């Protein structure tokens, strides 16, 4: 079983704390990111999230469309969160196009999709566009973006190509536009996330709703190889994808063959591995506890949940206890 990389978690999510001073529960909580309802402190759900943030019951929050109306509102919301938890990660899905939380004009938006950018803009213009996007996110207080998508554009894909989320069908073109995206965000001090490893483009299904099978290809891996070799890859999001011929029993999110053998050992990625939303249908029908343990033992670092509660229980509390129990039962080993 894979040992916890607690030093990594503390370094990323709890900078400034002495490792000896951080309890097991505190360390485990930093492995969890949650979504929440509400867009201001007037909302009860938002206040509940703020309370938990103050007690550091999770390492980060993810912002969805339900949390964003305009720039003034978003700044105020994030200010309230950071007053409770100054070192928390504030993440957003801002790809542009269909997957955008910054459609309001106050964000200098809306921003075009990845496919539109790569089809109409040269690299310099793309960099300038993504710089504007990054500046707007930074001004609001966001420090992590779940983008860029580095999947390949395949016309048969209902979730990637149909929504124009990929830059191109050509891996070399994906690489140069993804580099422009990552470089623009790095300049503003915002972390980026390559997704959806090992490549969602060939899937004929939407992993939000159904089991999604993909065929692994050298081209699909090229954007990851390039970003890892150049040092641009900071965080990689693993998709709920069943990879034919490698692990047809587990989605990539729960697969040691994909995360440890392929991503860690073969591609030499030493950064942070985050799951796609663990509440998506594509992750399978196993019990939540089994999924959580499998993800960690497969080599994953951070668990992402889009909802603040699961069956009326706070997600962070539930998942933290699952992990602690697994450690105590030696289902997960601890360094």
Label for each model-derived stretch:
Residues 19-51, 265-266, 285-335:
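Preference for extracellular/luminal or secreted protein segments
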Residues 191, 221-236, 241:
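Aromatic-lined glycan-binding groove of carbohydrate-active enzymes
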């Amino acid at each position: 079983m894979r040992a916890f990389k607690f030093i990594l978690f503390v370094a990323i999510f709890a900078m400034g704390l002495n490792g000896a001073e951080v309890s097991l529960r505190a360390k485990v909580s930093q492995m969890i990111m949650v979504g929440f309802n509400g867009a201001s402190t007037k909302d009860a759900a938002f206040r509940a999230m703020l309370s938990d943030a103050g007690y550091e019951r999770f390492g980060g929050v993810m912002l969805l469309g339900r949390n964003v109306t305009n720039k003034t509102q978003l700044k105020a919301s994030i200010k309230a969160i950071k007053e409770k938890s100054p070192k928390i990660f504030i993440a957003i899905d801002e790809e542009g196009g269909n997957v955008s939380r910054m459609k309001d004009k106050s964000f200098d938006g809306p921003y075009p999709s990845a496919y539109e950018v790569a089809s109409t803009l040269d690299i310099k213009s793309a960099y300038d566009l993504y710089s504007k996007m990054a500046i707007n996110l930074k001004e609001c207080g966001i420090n992590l973006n779940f983008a860029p998508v580095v999947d390949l554009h395949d016309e048969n894909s209902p979730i990637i190509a149909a929504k124009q989320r990929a830059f191109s069908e050509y891996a070399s073109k994906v690489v140069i536009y993804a580099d422009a995206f990552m470089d623009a965000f790095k300049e503003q001090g915002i972390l980026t996330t390559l997704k959806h490893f090992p490549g969602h483009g060939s899937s004929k299904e939407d992993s939000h709703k159904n089991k999604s099978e993909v065929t692994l290809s050298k081209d699909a891996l090229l954007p990851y190889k390039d970003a890892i070799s150049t040092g641009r890859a900071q965080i990689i999001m693993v998709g709920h994808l069943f990879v034919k011929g490698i692990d047809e029993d587990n989605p990539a999110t729960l697969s040691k063959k994909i995360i440890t053998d392929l991503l860690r050992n073969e591609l030499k990625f030493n950064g942070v591995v985050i799951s796609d939303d663990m509440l998506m249908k594509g992750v399978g029908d196993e019990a939540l506890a089994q999924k959580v343990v499998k993800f960690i033992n497969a080599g994953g670092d951070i668990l992402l949940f889009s909802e603040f509660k699961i069956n009326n229980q706070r997600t962070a509390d539930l998942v933290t206890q699952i992990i602690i129990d697994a450690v105590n039962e030696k289902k997960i080993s601890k360094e």
